[in-house]
């Protein structure tokens, strides 16, 4: 376990300060892009709406299981073979874990929304936020754009960093690859619309299971980070709002980090939203909080995000050092 902790510590630091070099992914496809292509291939082949709901559910289930198993096998092959490469193998594993984390890329995309709002106004903000959310930004005002960016930041703190780190510690590269495939499948086919309701049902449920613990860990880390960086009362408020409102969210997991951020920042988040032609109703998290968010609130959310990531990284580094000393 201490080896995994050391690898994860270095990967978290590398991802934070270097991130994903765009020049690299212009030349070779990102692993998540390859996952997406495999899912898209299977969806086009087996999601035939002339089939019955039960057959579509079965097709989606077997596609997801098959791709997850392929990821597990690939992860096992790499995990068993890389040690034979010595230092180069260790460096390769650190780099693999790094590219499957998303601290810097997530923060950069969210920061771009605040920058666009300040420099280009509402139209620029809408364009920037459309890069990170699935909802229709066309009718969002400044508050709606800002809340959407903050909600995406909170949810993806779990999905993009805490969950991959968790599953790497639990299952090594096989666990990390499997999680990223599951999460990618959910983002592509796990929607409650006519096209994906049946075919993507299994992927959506599996993603709920995979994110159950990481989402709650993220909310707890955000609450602790609020207490450390602001004050104890603010941290208690973040934790209290999370415990009270997390289950109000339509997602069984996203509500935990989002409500912790809402409480820690004093904002009202979530509520009704538009996905294309589909309007999804929902209650506000921390309904008594500020609703007319702006670019300054995005900056505050980014500060909380980085504080949360620093806390997690510090805990991982501390655990790795303890493991080395005890070992």
Curated annotation (Swiss-Prot):
Coiled coil: none
Annotated compartments: Cell membrane
GO CC term (a single one): plasma membrane
Entry's Gene Ontology BP terms: cobalamin biosynthetic process
Pfam families referenced in this protein's UniProt entry, alphabetically: CobD_Cbib (PF03186)
Keywords: Cell membrane, Cobalamin biosynthesis, Membrane, Transmembrane, Transmembrane helix
GO molecular function, a single term: threonine-phosphate decarboxylase activity
UniProt KW Transmembrane helix keyword: yes
Membrane topology: Multi-pass membrane protein
Positions of transmembrane segments: 60-80, 82-102, 159-179, 304-324
Domain of life of the native organism: Bacteria
The protein's annotated pathway: Cofactor biosynthesis; adenosylcobalamin biosynthesis
Role description: Converts cobyric acid to cobinamide by the addition of aminopropanol on the F carboxylic group.
Record family assignment: Belongs to the CobD/CbiB family.
Protein name, entry field: Cobalamin biosynthesis protein CobD
Originating organism: Brucella anthropi (strain ATCC 49188 / DSM 6882 / CCUG 24695 / JCM 21032 / LMG 3331 / NBRC 15819 / NCTC 12168 / Alc 37) (Ochrobactrum anthropi)
């Amino acid at each position: 376990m201490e080896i995994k902790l050391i690898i994860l510590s270095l990967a978290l630091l590398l991802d934070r300060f270097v991130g994903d070099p765009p020049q690299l992914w212009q030349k070779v496809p990102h692993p998540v892009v390859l996952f997406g292509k495999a899912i898209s291939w299977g969806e086009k082949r087996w999601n035939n709406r002339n089939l019955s709901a039960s057959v579509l559910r079965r097709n989606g289930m077997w596609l997801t299981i098959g791709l997850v198993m392929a990821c597990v096998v690939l992860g096992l092959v790499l995990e068993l073979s890389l040690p034979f490469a010595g230092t180069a193998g260790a460096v390769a594993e650190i780099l693999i874990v790094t590219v499957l984390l998303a601290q810097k890329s997530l923060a950069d995309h969210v920061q771009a929304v605040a920058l666009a709002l300040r420099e280009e106004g509402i139209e620029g903000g809408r364009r920037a936020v459309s890069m990170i959310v699935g909802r229709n930004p066309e009718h969002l005002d400044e508050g709606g754009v800002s809340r959407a960016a903050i909600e995406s930041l909170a949810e993806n703190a779990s999905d993009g960093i805490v969950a991959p780190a968790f599953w790497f510690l639990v299952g090594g590269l096989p666990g990390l690859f499997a999680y990223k495939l599951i999460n990618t499948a959910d983002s592509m086919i796990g929607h409650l619309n006519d096209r994906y309701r049946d075919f993507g049902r299994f992927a959506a449920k599996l993603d709920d299971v995979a994110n159950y613990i990481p989402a709650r860990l993220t909310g707890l880390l955000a609450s602790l980070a609020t207490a450390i960086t602001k004050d104890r009362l603010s941290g208690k408020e973040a934790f209290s709002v999370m415990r009270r409102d997390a289950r109000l969210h339509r997602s069984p997991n996203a509500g935990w980090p989002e409500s912790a951020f809402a409480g820690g920042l004093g904002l009202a988040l979530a509520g009704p939203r538009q996905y294309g032609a589909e309007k999804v109703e929902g209650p506000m998290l921390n309904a008594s909080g500020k609703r007319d968010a702006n670019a300054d609130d995005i900056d505050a959310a980014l500060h909380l995000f980085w504080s949360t990531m620093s806390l997690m990284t510090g805990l991982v580094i501390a655990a790795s050092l303890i493991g080395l000393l005890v070992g």
